[in-house]
Amino acid sequence: MSSTAVPTRRERQRQATYDEIVTVSRQLLRHGRDVSLRAVSAEMGLTAPALYRYVDSHAELMALVARAVFADVVGEITVARDRHPDDDPAAQIVAAVSAFRRWALGNREEFRLVFASPPTPETEALAESAAQRPITTLDGCVPEELGAHEFSAFFSDIFTRLWTKYRFPVPADDELPPGVLQVLSGPAEPGDKLATLGEVTPGMVWMFERAWARLYGTVTLEVFGHVHPGFITTGALFEATVLDIGRDLGLAGEWDRLQAIARG
């Protein structure tokens, strides 16, 4: 079917069933219930064999759910970003990471699924494959599966514009630990949008990785209640983390206005 063709009735019905499968699965997930093929089929009034006409396995079911969750996350952080002009990437990135935190705290089970689930044989195979390739772009920090690539690309775009505007210090190759340089070195891939800047270096990708690790670590600790509740309700730990990252990215002088954005 061409991209402009009108879906047939059968195709529309099949898509509607997929949408219902994802909706029911997410409802089960949000209520802390088992998201199994049997449970989903029961909620939909189907037999398990009937559900297998749409999904082949539990892994495929969870992949469908994960893609839907990532789409929602990217949608929310996009709305937050777009409240600020493109020539203010500092405001955009603070607004986006704050929206990500709010989403995570409000959707703990979905956060657990896409950001904190233990590896499966399928995801381990993807990770092993990715480990054989050097990271040459910011959005190459996340393997392209389950919608995670779009999430990473969203932040890599803002991060690149931040560097273009603020020119924050980036470590040279000889300042990076050997193990880090080995992972981050390699020829740029044809068509990489970042390669057109002529400025993407292992040090820049390392800065991106470190910023994400600190942000993700803080949000994960908050989501699972591994810090004092007062730090979560006040947002103090998150704000301190964003400020620490901001210092590395040349934004310390703008913290007063950015803090107001972080508090939303």
Name each region found by the language model:
Residues 62-89:
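Short N-terminal edge-element motif at the start of the domain
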Residues 80-110, 146-154:
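Hydrophobic alpha-helical connector segments
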Residues 45-55:
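Short hydrophobic/aromatic patch on the recognition helix
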Residues 1-34, 39, 56-63, 68:
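Basic, helix-initiating cap at the start of DNA-binding domains
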Residues 153, 157-264:
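C-terminal peripheral helix-coil segments that are non-catalytic and often amphipathic
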Residues 20, 39, 92-95, 99, ...:
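Amphipathic alpha-helical interaction segments
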Residues 107-142, 164-181, 220, 228:
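Amphipathic alpha-helical segments used for helix-helix packing
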